[in-house]
């Protein structure tokens, strides 16, 4: 039975299957690409945290939800010998954030209506303490993704990858536009993915130059 059909039955999830919730083409690419010498930073913890921890040298995992972070931490403690810490960076209440555009990298807000009036500025900026060109891969699959992109793009080393899930969403157009040109190579992994009946798009950009292309 194809993996897609298997994933649609029962109670399977990315968390129970210990995989990132990306399209199947992206999952195959990541499985083939990751290796033990890599440093990875991820916005959004879960099945991807196990997946990366089992395959790379260093992992920094950022999570905004305290209940979910505790669940992931407990599962890592029990089931993962190479247990990375999950760093909890909660959003902060901000009345001005209610008027911000989730497509604006300077907005620091989520497109999820349940987070209206909350700012993810500290969450997006959690990568700022690392040197430029430090990570082999930055995985953006959490909140306020355009803002996370703004802070993380310069942290990808030459030859490294920046991966954005759900890249087809209109409010991520800034990311696509910012990485056009000779400094980055785009890898488009559109198609089906586990646990969903619909197709979506996961994109990876490989940094080809020592310059990130950002101002």
Put a short name on every predicted segment.
Residues 1-37, 107-119:
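Class I SAM-dependent methyltransferase Rossmann-like catalytic core
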Residues 19-23, 45, 142-145, 194-195:
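Aromatic-acidic/polar surface patches that form glycan- and anion
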Residues 24-97:
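SAM cofactor-binding core of SAM-dependent methyltransferases
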Residues 24-28, 50, 121-125, 133, ...:
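Short, contiguous clusters of charged residues that form electrostatic/catalytic patches at enzyme active sites
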Residues 40, 61, 139, 163-164:
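Generic enzyme active-site microenvironment
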Residues 43, 64, 142, 166-167:
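Generic detector of well-ordered alpha-helical packing
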Residues 73-132:
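S-adenosyl-L-methionine
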Residues 127-137, 143-215:
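C-terminal substrate-binding/active-site "lid" region of AdoMet-derived donor-dependent transferases
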């Amino acid at each position: 039975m194809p993996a897609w059909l298997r994933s649609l039955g029962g109670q399977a999830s990315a968390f129970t299957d210990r995989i990132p919730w990306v399209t199947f083409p992206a999952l195959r690419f990541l499985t083939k690409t990751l290796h033990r010498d890599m440093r990875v930073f991820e916005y959004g913890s879960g099945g991807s945290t196990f997946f990366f921890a089992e395959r790379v040298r260093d992992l920094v995992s950022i999570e905004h939800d305290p209940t979910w972070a505790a669940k992931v931490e407990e599962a890592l403690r029990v089931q993962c010998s190479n247990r990375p810490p999950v760093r909890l960076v909660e959003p902060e209440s901000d009345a001005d954030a209610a008027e911000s555009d989730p497509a604006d990298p300077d907005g620091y807000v989520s497109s999820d209506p349940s987070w209206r009036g909350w700012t993810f500025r500290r969450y997006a900026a959690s990568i700022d303490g690392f040197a430029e060109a430090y990570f082999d891969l930055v995985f953006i699959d959490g909140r306020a993704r355009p803002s996370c992109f703004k802070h993380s793009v310069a942290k990808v080393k030459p030859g490294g990858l920046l991966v954005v899930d759900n890249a087809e969403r209109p409010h991520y157009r800034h990311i696509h536009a910012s990485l056009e040109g000779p400094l980055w190579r785009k890898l488009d992994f559109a198609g089906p993915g586990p646990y969903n009946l619909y197709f979506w798009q996961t994109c990876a950009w490989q940094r080809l130059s020592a310059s990130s292309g950002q101002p």
